């Protein structure tokens, strides 16, 4: 990626340019992976495209292919780095309403050591609020936009 694809006022663009230090675990022309400063659990890593994309809604198909292909490699390296790791959460917050804080697309890879880690990924079951017609209406609306 070229420097002109980065923004001056973006925290992650500054990290990519080396203006702000990071604990980098992987870097190539497309992505940079570094430890999240918060370390939700030990090894919490961010995978960041070297092209400024605000969130998934800015991705072209080529952006997705170029960036997302590194998830397995980084995830496997995290798992191998510590035998105490039992699992891994991979998540992305897209937009403020979804919890995105830094407006540069990034993927969180959060190692899990036990089911008592301080990580919470809520799962709400709203199936009782859906009948067959509503499921079909939602599915059709998404399908019509592909």
What does each model-identified segment do?
Residues 1-146:
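HIT superfamily nucleotide-processing domains
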């Amino acid at each position: 990626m070229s420097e002109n694809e980065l923004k001056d006022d973006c925290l992650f663009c500054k990290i990519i340019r080396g203006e702000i230090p990071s604990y980098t675990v992987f870097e190539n022309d497309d992505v940079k992976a570094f430890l999240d400063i918060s370390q939700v659990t030990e090894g919490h890593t961010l995978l960041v495209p070297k092209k400024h994309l605000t969130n998934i809604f800015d991705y072209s198909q080529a952006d997705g292919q170029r960036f997302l292909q590194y998830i397995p490699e980084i995830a496997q390296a995290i798992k191998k780095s510590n035998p105490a790791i039992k699992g891994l959460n991979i998540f992305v917050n897209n937009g403020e309403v979804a919890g995105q804080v830094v407006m540069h697309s990034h993927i969180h890879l959060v190692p899990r050591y036990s089911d008592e880690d301080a990580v919470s990924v809520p799962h709400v079951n709203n199936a009782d609020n859906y009948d067959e017609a509503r499921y079909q209406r939602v599915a059709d609306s998404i399908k019509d936009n592909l």
